Amino acid sequence: MEKEVIAYLDNETIIDSQSVKNTNLKEIYFDNSKESLEVIRHSCAHLMAQAIKSLYPEAKFFVGPVIEDGFYYDFRVESKIGEEDLVKIEKKMKELAEAKIEISKYEITKNEALAKFQNDDLKQEVLLRIPDGAVSIYKQGEFEDLCRGPHVPNTKFLRFFKLTRVAGAYLDGDEKREMLTRIYGTAFADKESLKEYLTIIEEAKKRDHRKLGTELKLFTFDDEIGGGLPIWLSNGARLRSKLEHMLYKIHRLRGYEPVRGPELLKADAWKISGHYANYKENMYFTQIDEQEYGIKPMNCVGHIKIYQSDVRSYRDLPLKFFEYGVVHRHEKSGVLHGLFRVREFTQDDAHIFCMPSQIKEQVLEILAFVDNLMKLFDFSYEMEISTKPEKAIGDDEIWEVATKALKEALDEQGLKYGIDEGGGAFYGPKIDIKITDALKRKWQCGTIQVDFNLPSRFKLEYTDSDNEKKQPVMLHRAILGSFERFIGILTEHCAGEFPFFIAPTAVGIVPIGEAHIAYAKEIQKELLELNIDSEVYEKNESLSKKIRIAEKQKLPMILVLGDDEVAKRSVALRDRRAKEQKNLSLDEFIKLVKEKMSEVHF
């Protein structure tokens, strides 16, 4: 079936073969291309729904979209569905696929659809979100559902799929509404690709940062504190602190000035910025002395006020402010996920105020910063430019100038990039930095944004060489995105085996007996003076148990100290990363760890 056409491509729009006949549009073949997988997975979501309806006749369905690497469907059933039920649902799906059922499409008006599904409250919910006009329905056998498509023309194309997990999901992501059942799955065009993906999924489960965060005692969450509010334990706080200190030095070397703005600002400031009108639903507000205040979801307004605190000349530009800014954003509880999606997080945020002629130069410098940092952590990455969304501030000309500046910088660096039409923030176009981890998964992290809008709204000025007042350009920039998300990604990328220079505990020191503890603590103190954290395992336990405990913590290095080491002032080193054991003098060991720490270059 590799050469069979399953859909067509009209510019960026995928159109299924049920909708188009005798076309000159680009053909989408049955394979593992991005467009083909979107059609296959969308169709497989309906195949799963058809199987569920067959097994659970009372089932009612909400939405079943394609997501990164797969699909899901939210639905309501009377009985509880668990992981053990996925096998029988898969079995029914295979039966339906083997039956080679034709998939057809027809259209009715919205009013006709409301009447057709009058006894289905979930379908009524879906129809409320659909604009007036024609509504498309896809039918396969006795099963039919509202859908924009596209779908494959026959269930025979849906052979290589896997249901991966079952979960609860609040209706429309609102925790105040009922909990529906959600089943996730994936699908491919061939058996080998599915097998490869499932292998990655199994490895991802072992690397899950929520699991490793607990095992390595990095962070925790507590219902009494609230969802999406991470609590950093000692190990996690040390890891984060090392990352923060390293980035602080890098920023200073690149000419950034540290600043700090308040976390609570009057609503008036958010009205000027446009956040109040365009981002209010994502913010938290309170009343103080009968005035409305908003907790900041972004750091830009504080940095603007720092810019306005002094008279600025063209000789001062570019001005580069950076802050580890704590921000809060309202997220529905249904989308919270470990450190990846939280309500409070800290951005490695910077804002650069410059002249229009300096935009490309500054973006190029940021791109070099990104490249150095990603190489340090062994991440590959790609760039994507997001353009003007439907809901935006500023006229088209301003957006065009800003978007062009980003493209020119990327072109000059020779970097390939994609275009996300309409994916920009409401106040300007942006470059999204997407990193690829050890499991070949892509993650959205940092951003670079050009902003002509906020300088205009806040009436920012500088005096040019002709002594005339001009408006600066503002560049928003975060490279990691947030410490929380990046640490979550890094944890999974390296499976909890952090690089030596940021490992929360870089060295485990194991004295064999009580007589060796004093020497162990002497080494610990010397390491701490080098900003290297270590732990002495001094409990009255067997040597093998102490080593096993240290190994479970995935420490880069373990030192074993006995009579011989104390007498010779040496160490027995187990290097987890180099996978070797050797004896070194203490001086040689200290020299080794100094070299490890000096490997971080910028």
UniProtKB/Swiss-Prot annotation:
Keywords: Aminoacyl-tRNA synthetase, ATP-binding, Cytoplasm, Ligase, Metal-binding, Nucleotide-binding, Protein biosynthesis, RNA-binding, tRNA-binding, Zinc
First-tier enzyme category under EC: ligase
PROSITE patterns cross-referenced by the UniProt entry: AA_TRNA_LIGASE_II
Gene Ontology, cellular component aspect: cytosol
Cofactor note as given: Binds 1 zinc ion per subunit.
Spans annotated as Catalytic: 208-499
SUPFAM superfamilies reported for this sequence: Class II aaRS ABD-related, Class II aaRS and biotin synthetases, ThrRS/AlaRS common domain
Recorded superkingdom: Bacteria
GO MF: ATP binding; metal ion binding; threonine-tRNA ligase activity; tRNA binding
InterPro entries for the chain: aa-tRNA-synt_IIb (IPR002314), aa-tRNA-synth_II (IPR006195), aa-tRNA-synth_II/BPL/LPL (IPR045864), Anticodon-bd (IPR004154), Anticodon-bd_dom_sf (IPR036621), Thr-tRNA-ligase_IIa (IPR002320), Thr/Ala-tRNA-synth_IIc_edit (IPR018163), ThrRS_anticodon (IPR047246)
Residues annotated to bind Zn(2+): C300, H351, H476
Named cofactor requirement(s): Zn(2+)
EC number(s) on file: 6.1.1.3
Family recorded in the similarity comment: Belongs to the class-II aminoacyl-tRNA synthetase family.
The protein's name in its UniProt record: Threonine--tRNA ligase
Organism: Campylobacter jejuni (strain RM1221)
Encoding gene, per UniProt annotation: thrS
